[in-house]
Amino acid sequence: MKKFYAIFTSLTLFSTVAKAQQTICGWITDEQRSPIEYANVIALSVRDSSLVTGAVTDNAGKFLLTLPANSAQVFLRVSGIGYEQRNVSLPLAGDTLLLKSEAKAMEGVTVTAQRPKMAIRNDALVTTIVGSSLAKAGSGNDVLKHIPLLTGKEGSYSVVGRGAAVIYINNRKITDATEIERLNSSDIKDVEVVTNPGARYDATVSAVIRIHTVRKVGDGFGFDVRTSAYYWENWDTYNQLNMYYRRNGLELTAGSAYELDNTYDNQTTTNEVQAANLWTNKWIKKAKYRNTHNNYTFSAAYEFSANHSVGARFFTNLLVGANNAYPNFSTDVLKNNALYDHIESRTNGTTTAIPNKSLSAYYVGKVGKLNIDFNTDYYYGEETELRTTTEQSANYDNRTVTSAGTHANKFFATKLVLSHPLFGGSLSVGNENTFTNHEQSYTNQEGIVTNAASTIKERNNAFFFEYSRLTPIGQLMAGLRYEHVNSDYYDQGVYSTEHSRTYNQWFPSLTFATKIKKVGLQLSYSAKTSRPSYRQLGTNVEYMNRFTRQSGNPTLKPATLHNISLVSNWDIFTFVANYTQTHNKIMHWNEQEGVNENITTLRYRNFKNLPVLTLSLTAAPRIGVWSPQLILFCQKQWFDIERLGSKFDLSKPIWGILWNNTFDFKDNWIAETRLKVTSKGIAENTELTRTTCAFNFSVRKAFLNDRLSVTVGVNDLFNRTANHVILYTNNFKTSVNQEYDSRQAYVTLRYKFNTARSKYKGTGAGQSERKRF
C-alpha cells in the first residue's frame, strides 16, 4: 500500500529520582516541533510486560509519569492514532525518538491519500482526517458529513441515538455555527464523537463532537474568503471573510458572514379531533420565506508561554432589515364528515431583532502539576415577531387577527476546571455557574387570544469531578456532577409559587475502554437531563387559526435520561449500540377549549417512560481512488399512549442507510456522492409515513497548491427529503405532508492565504443554557 514517509515524533525526557518515587516528564512533538496531543505513554515491566503506570499527552504534547519506589526495571511504549507503536528502553540513548506514521511514503512513487482511520480513544470514537481523503473535502461541514454516527448539516449535527451534539474546536465550545464552515478541512487533525459525555459537561449535553486542528507555525497576516450561490426554485447566497494577524504569542482575528435564504414550504395538513363530535380541518398551505443574516466575530488571544494564555471573543448576529413570511391557507372544516365551513386566509409575518451579542473570555494555565481552565460568558438577545392573519369564511364571520410576540434573553456564566495527577491517573474538579433571565410576551389586539407575559429567572450552580486512570486491563474514567437549579417564574410580573421550581440532582458517569488484540471496545454509562426550553415553559397562547392554538406548559418537569452505550472498532468496521431510558419525556399533546370543543390547543406534557435502542454498523474501506463508507442504522422504541379509550402502540422501528463515496483523482480533482435513505417508522408520538431519500453530488477542483478551490454540486437531486408525518395524542391526530425546495444546484469558490489554526483556547461556560433560548 502506498503510504506517506513517517511523520517524525521527537521525545525529550528527563527524570528525577526521589527517595520515594521516580518521575519521568517529557514532550512529544512532530518534526515541525508541533506538539502531538493525546499520545499514549505507558511504562511496562521488562520482566513480564505488565503495566506499571501510564499517561496521555496534553495539548502541549507534555506527559508526566510517576514510578513507584519499588517498581522493577521498566521500558516505555509510545503510541498514537496514525502512528506506529514503538517500545523504548530506559535510559534513552539520545533525546530524540522517531515514530513512523502508519501512512509511509514510498520513494519514487506517487502518494495518494489514505482512507480516514477510525479508532476508540478514551471516551470517544476518533476519525483521523489529516493525510486522508477527507483532508481535501473543503470545509469543516464537508468533513462532518462523512463522520460515522453524525447526521445534520451547516454546523448543526446530531449523534445517532443520542440527539443534538455540542461541538468543540480545540477544546473551545463553538457558539457560531458558521465557524464549522469557516474551518478548512486541510487544517483538521481528527474528529472525536463522544456518545456518553462525562461529568465535566453540562448535564443537558447528551453528545459531544470534538474537532482538533493541525498546529501551524508562522507569523504575519492571513485571510480566507468563500462565496457560494445556490439555485433551483430560488436564489440563495452565502459569503464569508475571515482575517488573521499573528505575531509571536499574539493572534487577532476578525470575521464576517452574510446569508440570504429564500424558501418555499407547501403543506397539506389534516387535523382530526374526536370530541363529542368529529371535527376535521383540511388545509393547504403555500408559503414563501425570506431570511437574511449577517454576523461578525472579533477575538484576541495571547500566549505568554507554553503554560499561560488568555483570550477574549465578541460575536454579534444581525437580522438584516426584517425576515418575512407569507403563508396562504385554504381550509375545509368538516363536522362529522359534513362540510361545516370553508376559510381562505393569508398571513403576513415579520421578524425583527435587536442584534444578539455575546462576549466570552478565558484563561488557560499551568502551575507546577496543576492545570487551570477558566471561562466566562455573557449573552443578550431580543426578537419580536409581528403577524397579521386575515380569514375569509364562507359560512361565518370574517376575521382579522393581529399579534405580537417578543422573546428577550440574557445570561452570565462562569466555569472553572482544575486538573492534577493523582495515584497514577488524573483528577479534575470544577464548578460552573449560570444566571439566566428570560422574558416573553404575546399580545392580540382583537382579544381573541388572551394576552400573556412571563419571566423566568434561573440559577444553576454545578460541581463536578472526573478521574481517569490507565489500568492493566484498560482505561477507566469515572465522574460525578451535582447541579442545584433554582427557577423563579413570574406571571404578569407576579411571582408564581405554583410554577417555580427547585431541583437538586446527581449525574454519575462511567466509561471503560480497552483493546483486545485488534478490536477496540468501549462501554459507558451516564445520567443526563433534558430541560424544557423557555418557549415550552411559557404561558403564551399563539393563534394559528380559528380552530387551532399553540401554547407552552409551565408545569413541565425536566426529563432524566439513563444511557448505556457500547462501541466496538475493528479494521474498517465500527459498531455502536445505545440504549436510553428517558423518564418524564417531553412531547406534544393537546387540550380542548372548555366552551368550544372544536378549538384545539397544542401543548406539551411529560410522559413517564420512553426506552429507545439504537444500533449502527459502519464499513469504511479504501479501494484505489475510491473511498466508500456505508452506514446501516436502526432505531427502535417501546412506547404506547392512551388514545380514544384504548392503548395505541407506537413501537414501529426506523431503519436507514447512509452511503458516502469519495473519488480522489489525479490533479486535485475530487468527486463525492452521498445517499441517505430513512424508512417509515415511529419516533416518540410521531409516525413517519413516507420513506425519504436524499442524493447529493459534487465535484471539487483545487488550484494554486490548494489555496484556491471551486466546488460544483447538487443537493437532494430527486427532491425527496421532505417528511410526511402523523402526530398522535389522546383524541387528536394531525397528518402533515410537506414539500419544500431542498433541491439546489450550487457553486462555491474558496481562497485562503497563510491561514492557521486559532490560538483561542476558551471552552465556554453555560453554553447549554443558550440552546434553551
Name every feature range the model reports, one short phrase each.
Residues N295-V320, I343-Q492, K515-G520, T574-V576, ...:
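Face-selective signature of the C-terminal outer-membrane beta-barrel domain
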Residues T455-E458, E498-R501, T529-H583, T600-L613, ...:
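Outer-membrane beta-barrel signature, preferentially recognizing the C-terminal barrel domain
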Residues H146, R172-G198:
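Short acidic/polar hinge/loop motifs at secondary-structure boundaries
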Residues D95-K100, G108, G140-V143, A177-T178, ...:
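N-terminal periplasmic accessory domains that precede
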Residues I42-L44, R77-Y83, A93-S133, G152-E154, ...:
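Short, acidic, small-residue-rich periplasmic hinge/interaction motif at the N-terminus
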